[in-house]
């Protein structure tokens, strides 16, 4: 992995290049280790700027926040947003932000204002994320999110999927929306 990132950085050969690493071992089957981050930051401190951690491992995210200065750590799910912020992380980058953005902003503002409602807001955000996952479980996450966005925006264009995904039938759409609205 070090050779992979090195080759990209060297071939681009531009100090303006900024790389946010994506740690999603369930999909990539290749975890981004702390040792790799350490090596990359030592060799390319101007280019390697942060990571989105979609591993679901809160301790890993918090450890990165603690161990790497001037390195932006983003939680890959709203569930870990507040813990990452508290540990000095940058925030969250999440697939569901089209739907949860308002609540994410509320959590972020409450955190920055040291508001005593931040824990309550984070709990609401985590519940919203869990509800989205439940609603999308029967059709797949991407397709389910498209169905929900279509409903929220009253725009069927959101339901269009590219292969290998296919548009859901009406009964599945109704099921997804029913769960989401519960």
State where each predicted segment sits:
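Flexible C-terminal active-site loop/helix
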Residues: 154-182
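Catalytic alpha/beta core domains of metabolic enzymes, predominantly
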Residues: 9-17, 24-129, 133-137
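Short amphipathic alpha-helical surface patches that mediate protein-protein
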Residues: 123-127, 150, 181
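Glycine-rich anion/phosphate-binding loops
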Residues: 2-3
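Conserved short secondary-structure transition element at the edge of the structured enzyme core
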Residues: 85-88, 129-163
